[in-house]
Amino acid sequence: MATLFTATVPSHHRFVSPSQHPKQSLLSQSLSVTFTENPQPTAVVTLQEQQLTDWITSPVTRRFGIGAGFTWAGFLAFGVVSEQMKKSRLDVFQEEDNTRGLEKQEEIILPNGIRYYDLQVGSGATPSSGYLVVFDVKGQVHGTEQVFVDTFGGKGKSLAMVMDSRPYSKGLCQGIEHVLRSMKAGGKRRVIIPPSLGFGDRNVEFGQGLEIPPSATLDYIIEVDTVYCFQTIV
């Protein structure tokens, strides 16, 4: 099942990949977990593994709430995700200094039909498969004023999504994930997504009168706030 949950994230947080935590010595060691199909009574996690799990879970819990923290604890404890934080760290203030807005927006057309305009170029990490991305998004049907999702300006909570985790929700689609792969933390982009990478020929209803008609072209504004980088344990 996909992992998509809402998050309230301070605007100054851009890239999180800590290296100076008291538990940092644990990050260079492999995570070995014993589990079965029924993990509750049989899963075994050593004290050292529990410390590593707590270290990753704590900041996620603070940013995304208890449920998200439990989700990551479950990933680590039960082998759903066998990953750990990278040890490198990019200073937040330096990253924000290097983020720059663009006076002139150039249209980029991708082979798959996606068009986008960079409004602000970020200087942080670029999300990859399995990475946790926190971003704000506004989506509407192209050529109309019909907005179906908007988390900017306190209108809603920022979204947090694990890359390559489906199905999508909250008005997101395959085209959004494709675009995120070439963005950096701090970046902002307007994206126009064709129906083939949106919701296709389906009529999608979100409740409260919000819906996307069949074969709709979608117009999004995306701003990447934070990228949590994880390094696969081999």
Curated annotation (Swiss-Prot):
Subcellular location(s) of the protein: Plastid, Chloroplast thylakoid lumen
Segment annotated as transit peptide: 1-28
MF-aspect GO terms: peptidyl-prolyl cis-trans isomerase activity
GO cellular component, one term: chloroplast thylakoid lumen
InterPro entries: Chloro_FKBP-type_PPIase (IPR053111), PPIase_dom_sf (IPR046357), PPIase_FKBP_dom (IPR001179)
UniProt domain PPIase FKBP-type: residue ranges: 130-228
Catalysed transformations (reactions): [protein]-peptidylproline (omega=180) = [protein]-peptidylproline (omega=0)
Catalytic EC class: isomerase
Family recorded in the similarity comment: Belongs to the FKBP-type PPIase family.
Described purpose of this protein according to its UniProt entry: PPIases accelerate the folding of proteins. It catalyzes the cis-trans isomerization of proline imidic peptide bonds in oligopeptides.
Name this polypeptide is given: Peptidyl-prolyl cis-trans isomerase FKBP17-3, chloroplastic
Species name: Arabidopsis thaliana
